[in-house]
């Protein structure tokens, strides 16, 4: 059995794919399985991936499917994974050569079924290291985790036992997957090194804002419903309320303000405020918001209906 299975969804990334795959083939960890999932690419990505499989049959599996989006490709790759742990890597990103060895060893040393590392935002003209919040328990993790799939090592059995998968057809797939995963983690660990290079490029899904930005509403509602169905909503209510407010007042607000169509932009901004205050009318009394002094919280404490409109207008022009 491989120690780690790495799932790489591929869609029209011929310019970046070789660097990504080469970084995986250079891993110092032995017994690694690399699963390349061609999600209906229309460029030369499929041929590039096939060639890697041909020359590395002991480590590389190439599969292809009709285009279904990032979530669908990851779920498809999970069917072929046989490793003790699962990792995900986007096909335009790359990873330091000792990443999975360090993360796997940390998992074994601490008997952890979930391991995180730091990562590097890589812009055309600069880089920035993103360090994890030093949370001490799962409640803190739920509030402050970086909701990305690719800086994590996850016990495969944890995913199987809890029937976890990425939501097909939705943006913010990492939000839903990560928040559904956290309650089932038995022990988590952290490697204080920035192993992942998160490459920023124009035209990527993460940098395109349109009416699909509204899918954050569906994802957040899916998460809340999941916690209720599993009878853990009351246990994590403060964290879920905090996240609901944080997304709609911070990260998603920024994205909505960058939508070029004015009618769509204003509709979503109004809906965002109304949803927050309908689902969590007392969100300003949230214990995490009131007691944790980080920048976002200081800003959120000042928000009311009037200042929300002012902040929105400012974000539209900066």
Predicted regions and their residues:
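Hydrophobic alpha-helical segments that form the core
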Residues: 244-250
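Short, hydrophobic secondary-structure boundary micro-motifs
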Residues: 129-131, 236, 285-286
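Membrane-interface aromatic/basic loop that binds lipid-linked glycans or pyrophosphate carriers
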Residues: 259-318
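All-alpha amphipathic helical-bundle segments outside canonical DNA-binding/catalytic cores
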Residues: 233-243
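Nucleotide-sugar donor-binding/catalytic module of glycosyltransferases
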Residues: 1-221, 225
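Residue-level recognition of short, structured coil/turn motifs
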Residues: 57, 111, 186, 231-232, ...
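Catalytic core of nucleotide-sugar-dependent glycosyltransferases
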Residues: 195-201, 207-234, 250-280
């Amino acid at each position: 059995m491989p120690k780690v299975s790495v799932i790489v969804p591929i869609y029209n990334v011929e310019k970046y794919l070789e660097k990504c795959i080469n970084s995986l083939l250079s891993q110092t960890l032995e017994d690694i399985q690399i699963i390349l999932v061609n999600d209906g690419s229309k460029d030369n990505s499929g041929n590039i991936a096939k060639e890697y499989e041909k020359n590395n049959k002991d480590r590389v599996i190439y599969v292809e499917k009709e285009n279904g989006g990032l979530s669908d490709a990851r779920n498809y790759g999970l069917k072929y994974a046989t490793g003790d742990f699962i990792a995900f890597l986007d096909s335009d990103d790359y990873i330091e050569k000792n990443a999975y060895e360090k993360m796997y060893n940390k998992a074994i040393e601490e008997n952890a079924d979930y391991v995180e590392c730091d990562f590097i935002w890589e812009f055309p003209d600069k880089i920035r290291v993103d360090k994890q919040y030093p949370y001490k328990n799962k409640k803190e993790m739920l509030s402050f985790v970086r909701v990305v799939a690719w800086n994590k090592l996850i016990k495969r059995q944890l995913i199987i036992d809890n029937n976890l998968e990425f939501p097909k057809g939705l943006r913010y797939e990492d939000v839903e997957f990560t928040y559904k995963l956290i309650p089932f983690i038995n022990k988590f660990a952290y490697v204080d090194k920035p192993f992942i290079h998160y490459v920023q490029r124009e035209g990527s899904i993460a940098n395109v804002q349109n009416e699909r930005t509204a899918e954050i509403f569906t994802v957040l509602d899916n998460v809340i419903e999941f916690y209720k169905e599993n009878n853990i909503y009351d246990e994590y209510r403060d964290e879920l309320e905090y996240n609901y407010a944080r997304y709609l007042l911070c990260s998603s607000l920024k994205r909505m303000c960058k939508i070029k169509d004015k009618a769509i932009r204003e509709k979503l901004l109004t809906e965002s405020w109304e949803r927050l205050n309908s689902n969590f009318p007392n969100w300003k009394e949230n214990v995490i918001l009131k007691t944790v002094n980080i920048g976002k919280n200081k800003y959120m404490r000042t928000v009311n209906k009037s200042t929300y409109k002012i902040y929105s207008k400012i974000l539209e022009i900066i």
